[in-house]
């Protein structure tokens, strides 16, 4: 009897030890600058914290976003950090924070991301595609995207007609919106869209301040270029995982970590935006700003009807916008 009890106790102890071992997982991290980039460095901080949630993280840097996504699809990674525009295929709710004009300031983006990652939205963070389960385990802001032009004479959207505009090929919203203003959409990838601007293949490009120095946008601007000082959309990165490869409750702990680090990320973005030389910044009149807001609103509502954006997230973003700017024309309108 004593031997039996001893055997059971030993078995239980072994079982407990096995369950206490950290789950070893591979995470692909897209960063154009590889290990030296800000996104990869943030992932390193996150990986250290993840040890406390029962996961042993192996980070795999990827400088090509398509490769990171394909590696995730092929099962070479258990999770992937990539831009929300590409991650939208896994979760439309989280991926729609990047909607055109959806979060026109970093403060609004912070509110929207905080709400999305809150525990009350945990169910919306999980999706099932093709019999496979995915979960959004984090959202990180990369900052507002601004339009850069090679010639400052292109000082209005009307003057963009006929001009070549680099767009990310996998984001239908960009292509549709560029065509709506009469410009020519030049299909590109995140690895070459700024290069096309710098070498003169396109006249216009949209990018966050985050990309200004690393991608050398100043080369494309030269002495005659400009930046519309008007945020077109908020660029974010999503962290997508296969939850069955991680300890129970991991996703929410990870999301809480991202929320905690939002102020630090927003402060960094504000510094980067302030760092763009004033000589390039083209300030718009209040009248033009309202006109462009209306244009983006119409485009956003159209994209939602087409199924590109998530209607629930559009409602979240509108509430965030109107909580910051209650006097905005759209706050008294229905439709989102």
Residue ranges and their predicted role:
Residues 77-83, 186-187, 203-209:
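Paired acidic/hydrophobic, glycine-rich loop segments that form the ligand-binding mouth/hinge
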């Amino acid at each position: 009897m004593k031997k039996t009890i001893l055997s059971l106790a030993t078995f239980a102890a072994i079982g407990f030890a096995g369950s206490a071992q950290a789950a070893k997982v591979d995470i692909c991290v897209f960063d154009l600058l590889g290990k030296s980039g800000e996104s990869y460095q943030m992932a390193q901080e996150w990986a250290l914290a993840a040890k406390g949630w029962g996961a042993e993280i192996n980070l795999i840097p990827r400088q090509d976003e398509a490769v990171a996504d394909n590696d995730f699809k092929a099962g070479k990674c258990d999770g992937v950090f990539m831009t929300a525009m590409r991650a939208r295929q896994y979760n439309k709710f989280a991926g729609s924070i990047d909607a055109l004009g959806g979060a026109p300031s970093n403060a609004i983006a912070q509110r929207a991301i905080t709400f999305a990652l809150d525990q009350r939205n945990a169910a919306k963070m999980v999706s099932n595609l093709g019999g496979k389960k995915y979960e959004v385990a984090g959202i990180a802001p990369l900052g507002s995207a601004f339009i850069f032009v090679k010639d400052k004479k292109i000082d209005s959207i009307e003057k963009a007609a006929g001009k070549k505009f680099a767009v990310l090929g996998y984001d239908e919203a960009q292509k549709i919106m560029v065509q709506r203003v009469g410009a020519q959409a030049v299909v590109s990838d995140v690895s070459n869209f700024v290069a096309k601007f710098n070498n003169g293949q396109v006249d216009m490009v949209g990018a966050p301040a985050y990309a200004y120095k690393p991608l050398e946008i100043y080369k494309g601007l030269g002495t005659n270029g400009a930046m519309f000082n008007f945020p077109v959309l908020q660029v974010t990165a999503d962290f997508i995982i296969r939850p069955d490869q991680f300890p129970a409750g991991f996703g929410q702990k990870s999301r809480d970590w991202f929320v905690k680090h939002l102020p630090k990320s927003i402060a960094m973005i504000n510094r980067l935006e302030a760092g763009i030389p004033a000589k390039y910044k083209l300030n718009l009149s209040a009248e033009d700003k309202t006109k462009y807001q209306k244009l983006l609103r119409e485009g956003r509502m159209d994209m939602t009807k087409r199924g590109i954006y998530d209607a629930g997230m559009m409602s979240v973003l509108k509430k965030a916008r109107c909580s910051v700017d209650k006097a905005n024309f759209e706050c008294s309108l229905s439709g989102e």
